[in-house]
Amino acid sequence: MLRYYVMPLLLLVFLTSGAAGVTIEPDNPNYQYSGRIDFSNPKAPMMFWPGTSIRATFQGAVLKIILNDAHGKSFYSVFIDNDFEHPFIIECEAGEKVYDGPAGLTDDAHTLLLFRRTEASTGPTIFLGLDLKSGQALLEPPARPERRIEFYGNSITCGMGNEAPDSGDDDKMAEENNFLSYAAITARNLEAEYSCIAKSGIGILISWFDLIMPDYYYRLDPENSNSRWNFANYNPDAVIVNLFQNDSWLIKNLDPVPDSAAIVSAYIDFIGKIRSEYAEAKIFCTLGSMDATKSGSPWPGYIESAVVHKRAQGDENIEIYFFPFKNWSKHPRVRHHQEMADGLTQFVGVKMGWIPDDSTAVGFKDDAFLPDDL
């Protein structure tokens, strides 16, 4: 996929054909925001989470994007007129900057999608509006999707390393692209609005740091434990949980080491937290496609046992889907994410009644995964 890196300009009032431009401030009602965004200052909304996006329709050949990035480590994709094969990539610099949009636009109406590629660890970005040619304004945005989907996950869901070469390391933020994660692809396939709550290295019982998903999922600002998201602001039809990969690597570092019953109980508790926020959503408990789903792994069985328990308690609106392990030792690359999305799209779409059932995709389910001591 071709990519163009957009270099920042100094924040200036720009001139186009001798006429000063106009800034369309962030509180304009024709912006369409998606994801967990801090609107405490409507003229300076703050974006943290991977997959956060802003849509707009504008008129004219001039487009500049004004951002204030905290650390100069965040990356954004800019898509014009739904050309998803040729993104312009903004590599943020720290502070307030104006970034040029693509050259060669016609003077017609265009659609814009600004999409956060990187996860919250790169720091927040404040959106300060768009600069257009003098006399131009935002038009009415595309209709918001009727369907809504939300993901909770780890580095796989973030898209960590998905654009890295096969032989390379997969920890560079320039090579993390949430737009090409299985999660975002699945949302687009299903024509659903997308929300992504994910952090590389996180688990349910243990993470690579002193924070676990039960202490993270509810946050608006990911770095502030007192910052609480208002779940009433976004009610997904489907919630996909893809966690336990990091737990599978780290569980023996806990003292005492949890037994199978404790692991299942922790998963039940977390799914209960999600259910308490989304009473009507269908919850999909997934795992993979890294080695937590390899042959002989107990981790899919823990999830199956948790779901059996939830159903026995009366929660029938819950499903299981496992991504088969591909015998790949690194984070999934884009091709792996596409395969994951293909299967998940079919499974979720059928279960939600969004696509016809052609019986070509089923959850990867095996009784051999069930732990012996449950």
Predicted regions, residues:
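Bacterial N-terminal signal peptides that target proteins for export
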Residues: 1-7
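Hydrophobic h-region of N-terminal signal peptides that target proteins for export
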Residues: 10-18
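N-terminal secretory targeting modules
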Residues: 19-152, 157-175, 352-374
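Conserved SGNH/GDSL esterase-like catalytic core that processes O-acyl groups on lipids
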Residues: 49-51, 117-124, 162, 167-257, ...
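Conserved beta-strand scaffold positions in the cores of enzyme catalytic domains, especially
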Residues: 151, 194-196, 320-322
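Conserved hydrophobic/aromatic pocket- or pore-lining residues that grip, position, or stack substrates
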Residues: 154, 186, 274
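Alpha-helical cap/lid subdomain in secreted, periplasmic
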Residues: 218-365, 369-370
